[in-house]
Amino acid sequence: MRYLTAGESHGPSLTAIIEGIPAGLTLHPADIDHELQRRQGGYGRGARMSIETDRVQISSGVRHGKTTGAPITLTVINKDHQKWLDVMAVGDIEETLKLKRRVKHPRPGHADLVGGIKYHFNDLRDALERSSARETTMRVAVGAVAKRILAELGIDMLHHILIFGGITITILYKLSFRELQERALHSELSIVNPKQEEEIKTYIDKIKKEGDTIGGIIETIVQGVPAGLGSYVQWDKKLDAKLAQAVLSINAFKGVEFGVGFDMGFQKGSQVMDEITWTPTQGYGRQTNHLGGFEGGMTTGQPLVVKGVMKPIPTLYKPLMSVDIDSHEPYKATVERSDPTALPAAGVIMENVVATVLAKEILETFSSTTMSELQKAFSDYRAYVKQF
């Protein structure tokens, strides 16, 4: 399985082409639209989300509600493009129109300046448009297809926010997977403690008035993955490493950890390692899950626990100082539309990116020309793991 995305933030559309999806997977536009709507939601989103109503168009690879095994083409139209017809025109335009929305004061924390240097851009909008988080629309669309595969194999997942702009979400007692999932899904903030909703919303409103932004830490949990996915035989086959790369590829993500993560640096080995158990009904298990479901780059059969840290959004309504790329004089950075926070949306993106990596690993590991073939191979493997 592989995919490519294309499109600019204010261009006419965004596109993804996915190759390697088995034939016979039940797939409808509504499956993808559901994830796209989740990405657009959450408290703190800005004006762009009131303009766009993301809906996918499937133009290949699906017929009568089933995948055919051919490449799948997904497209999402950018409604906001109608206001940017001159600025984002494919053909040449008058010089005055070119200068209309030219970006020459790069924003600290964005790809503007370095992208302009790398690709020799006189107008930093050429870097801004593609590096925008709008691109993640299509990674969520691809992830929605991946989640359909995982669901057919009995794999489920969730995400929730652990730290919201410096406020730690308090979890007073251990919640089951289903309890975490339900609470996060019914929260505008993707948090599992409803008593903290108003406190955080008030904080977001305060940050917005100040023209500032906040980040936080997101946790994604995956249930139902058997032991043995990934491999230790080469560095690039380790599944946790693949997930780390994928999570860090999400806009504004600056760190990733598994299980208790960086806290391991403060603990002894006897406190960190997960003791092994075995029962006739369940097979192998672990007393704990400090390592987040991974040993030696492979899944252990425990829930996968992946955490990602998102920096505050770099576009500020009270912009930081920058430099004019023509005169090299100090200037305030360019201001584009922005949100005080996009943590709930980033959680949806992270969840779908993780789903894509897991689906790809499964499709590469098991016979997967058709869904029925994949389901049998996966079921047989589960049975083998249980009786090992």
From Swiss-Prot:
InterPro entries: Chorismate_synth (IPR000453), Chorismate_synth_AroC_sf (IPR035904), Chorismate_synthase_CS (IPR020541). FMN binds at R130, S131, S132, N251, A252, G296, K311, P312, I313, P314, T315, R337. Keywords: Amino-acid biosynthesis, Aromatic amino acid biosynthesis, FAD, Flavoprotein, FMN, Lyase, NADP. Its EC number is 4.2.3.5. It comes from Streptococcus pyogenes serotype M28 (strain MGAS6180). The gene is aroC. GO terms for molecular function: chorismate synthase activity; FMN binding. GO terms for biological process: amino acid biosynthetic process; aromatic amino acid family biosynthetic process; chorismate biosynthetic process. Pathway: Metabolic intermediate biosynthesis; chorismate biosynthesis; chorismate from D-erythrose 4-phosphate and phosphoenolpyruvate: step 7/7. NCBIfam families: aroC, PRK05382.1. This reaction introduces a second double bond into the aromatic ring system. This is Chorismate synthase.
